[in-house]
């Protein structure tokens, strides 16, 4: 009966000592995994940041295109039909009714002052 107790005690001591080693080993493995996880998170964060920067650049480009397209239209040159309510004749020109008789596509044209 004494040998059974000694054997049991020996097995118990070995199990506890090996269990502690496994616990320390598990702790180290967890630290390594969290460090790897942090590096993966950093990589994912950088990738997301790059995509967001590309998206912002694209949106800013679209805004600048809109501002270019929304500029005032170019002026109308001499002898070109114009609208009497909204004359867009160039400077030095006036939107007037033609002095010549005939059939005209538009009734007003840009002429020099």
Curated annotation (Swiss-Prot):
One of its GO terms (molecular function) is sodium channel inhibitor activity. Residues 1-21 form the signal peptide. Keywords: Disulfide bond, Ion channel impairing toxin, Knottin, Secreted, Signal, Toxin. GO terms for cellular component: extracellular region. Residues 22-74 form a propeptide. Expressed by the venom gland. Probable ion channel inhibitor. Belongs to the neurotoxin 14 (magi-1) family. 01 (HNTX-16) subfamily. This is U11-theraphotoxin-Hhn1a.
